[in-house]
Amino acid sequence: MAAPPDLQDEPLSLGSPGSQWFGGRGDGEDEATAVMGARPAQQDGEPAWGSGAGAGVTSSRELCSGPARSPPVAMETASTGMAAVPDALDHSPSSTLKDGEGACYTSLISDVCYPPREDSAYFTGILQKENGHITTSESPEEPETPGPSLPEVPGMEPQGLLSSDSGIEMTPAESTEVNKILADPLDQMKAEAYKYIDITRPQEAKGQEEQHPGLEDKDLDFKDKDTEVSTKAEGVRAPNQPAPVEGKLIKDHLFEESTFAPYIDELSDEQHRVSLVTAPVKITLTEIEPPLMTATQETIPEKQDLCLKPSPDTVPTVTVSEPEDDSPGSVTPPSSGTEPSAAESQGKGSVSEDELIAAIKEAKGLSYETTESPRPVGQVADKPKTKTRSGLPTIPSPLDQEASSAESGDSEIELVSEDPMASEDALPSGYVSFGHVSGPPPSPASPSIQYSILREEREAELDSELIIESCDASSASEESPKREQDSPPMKPGALDAIREETGSRATEERAPSHQGPVEPDPMLSFAPAAALQSRPEPSSGDGASVPEPPRSQQQKPEEEAVSSSQSPTATEIPGPLGSGLMPPLPFFNKQKAIDLLYWRDIKQTGIVFGSFLLLLFSLTQFSVVSVVAYLALAALSATISFRIYKSVLQAVQKTDEGHPFKAYLELEITLSQEQIQKYTDCLQLYVNSTLKELRRLFLVQDLVDSLKFAVLMWLLTYVGALFNGLTLLLMAVVSMFTLPVVYVKHQAQVDQYLGLVRTHINTVVAKIQAKIPGAKRHAE
């Protein structure tokens, strides 16, 4: 048999894997035009799919061997051609849909001049996952041939250009690339509809392969990529060797390799004339087995973890005591490529919406209860039971429940709040674990729910016993902080109510008793109101008792007793009207001042009184600067003289008594920050009250008071004309040290004269007010 003609001088087709195909875009476009013009002729004989495959086989055979030559050994025709021609990408799918029933035409062309590349594995959907490495479809950056590499092609991945009707299996990761690449939406729909289609070799070829050992080098192993490439290279590098084999066997082998080859629509005119001959080809379609689906699903675990929408075969459960199971074996992949909608997944749930709403309302009703009695098993089996401890409102809001049910779809919800002293191995009430459980949705009477019912009944009994003991041991005010520490997951509304109640109690305790009967604080009344609003009456089926109102009634007498015991100390707090004295100085207090004014210690009172008189008389004769300087010199002369005297005396007497002013030096006269703050607050109080009073008088808030102030200022004008300021200060100091003593000695006579003076003053004031119309009406 003659050798096939050398095809290097001819422009290579798109199906050849050589580098000459990438030379220009014009050749590819001409070839695509030629193919589109001849498609109706290919559909006359057989169906579109079979005829396309048959034509491809015949054309490849005729092209390699010539019209008078027997067909050579089948060559693999792996090509990346269509990805490099954007114009061909736009024409080939659309023209196929117009002429035929939507099937893709396949033309297989063997190239005897160029060795095959590893592109045969590039277009397969199985993609040797078992070898543990990624294939060329996932990493096209590793070319194996001397021709231009795939990244140089301006298009996208070649397997994305073809629909899955042509025999290419696509994994879910590849389907996302197909959605981005296909320009025609009909091809996109077909690609999504048929994701798992594989064309396998018929059984006849396997039987004939045993009789022809020379062709065994062409067999492909899906699990050994290296062996596949080496065997194909040996079988193809002898283009001139004729192979006298039967045509059907060659066709079968060619069709077997078409599983790896792309579907090429662009052919030259010469190639198209040869491809009009059709030959029968047997096509078998096999479905992908479930283990393969599991392997492909395990390649993208991140997407499964992020998606919370389960398929009808999986039911996510929300539990409290079981940890999360992240093992791949526990995750069952969806049975179909598409995920169920939210309406479908919710319709298949084990808990209906009405039951969920009833459970939420029941949880709200039991939020502030302190004891709970166990429910019968039949009643709890109808709907999920929610149980919370008193003072621990760990109840999710209805919005949270609806959001969680919408996200998780079919779910079994168990809202169980753990008591910290009920069981040591139980998890906290705020802990929730998510896990996927394969199988049908559980029924309400499943063993897991029955187990949770028994567990909740046991915890309810323990809760009731603990609450009874805690009520006898301490009051509710002592229990609330401990419960807050035991259970951090508490709703913000309940925390706000507790804070407002405690703040109002502190305000009530600090309230002064001289302001009359204590009125109920609005903050204090708000917290119990909020608690009562969120505490509806329990249903008839609940046997739990509500001892909260009696406990609150018992707290009221205790709070009143505490507030009454603290009321005497509250009156001592300085206020705008209650405090009249400044805080005591560290070395001078009120009792010392009284002792000085009443001359109880004559020596000490004489020294202080003489010092004040000397200072004031000096100020009347000299300036303030001169008086300060002279007083400082006098004090220093006295202390220095005394210090020298003591030193000489100790030297003469040969004694060591130390410093004569040692006691005064060790005396603490510093003011602490608290004392300074007290003095500042007291001074601020007086200054603010004085400013307010002056504003009221000068702005005539009260006409009578303003007139009185005017009369006082008028009298002071006469006093100022007669006396100096220092003279008035001297008179005040003298009066301070003399009047108290005189009043003590002549108290009866002084009171009599003071009464007469007070009566006379009141008479004069009455006469003045009678002459002023506005003042008279104001007095009435």
UniProtKB/Swiss-Prot annotation:
Name by which UniProt lists this protein: Reticulon-1
Transmembrane segments: 607-627, 709-729
GN (gene name): Rtn1
Residue ranges occupied by any Reticulon domain in the UniProt entry: 593-780
Main localisation: endoplasmic reticulum
Biased composition (Basic and acidic residues): 497-512
Biased composition range(s): Low complexity: 328-341
Residues bearing the modification Phosphoserine: S13, S70, S327, S350, S352, S487
GO biological process terms, semicolon-separated: negative regulation of amyloid-beta formation
